[in-house]
Amino acid sequence: RRFDLPVRRFLLELAPFESFDLEMARMVSGDPRAGERLDWLLRYTTMLRYDDCQCFHFWSGFRAFLRWEMDREYTEEKRKALFSRGGLYYELKEDYAHALECYTSGGDHAKVSELLIRNAELHPGMGHYAEMEQYYRALPGAEILASPSLMQGMSMLCALSADYDGSEHW
């Protein structure tokens, strides 16, 4: 335990994410000194790596340790909140595939449905159907039937998959 509490907390809160940039580190951790912490970690440790000046990731063995430590120290509620903040970051960046992954990991079914509805309301050429297919298909039929937008999205997804009977069903 050679790190002080703010650095340990910062590390644990970034552990769920494969890679991150400074903006995501700030948003997920809520730490206004995220840039200083990243700089310190890069200078004085070997646990943090970067692909370019913007994209950081942990050495895989250290990330596994951080995730284990996070599971021990954080409540399920706290872990869900981290995934929710990560999902919001990706949503604001319009990276819906990663946003859905985060919201699903955090158990936020309402946000998953909201993103799928928003996607279905886009012009068909602008939708992200391939990236979101597993999330559409995981929705309960009753939930799809309750939303004309989700029915439209499922119909489009089925048509794009050459499942014309399924498309007609929705």
What are these regions (language model features)?
Residues 1-71, 81:
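C-terminal boundary/linker of central alpha/beta nucleotide-binding cores
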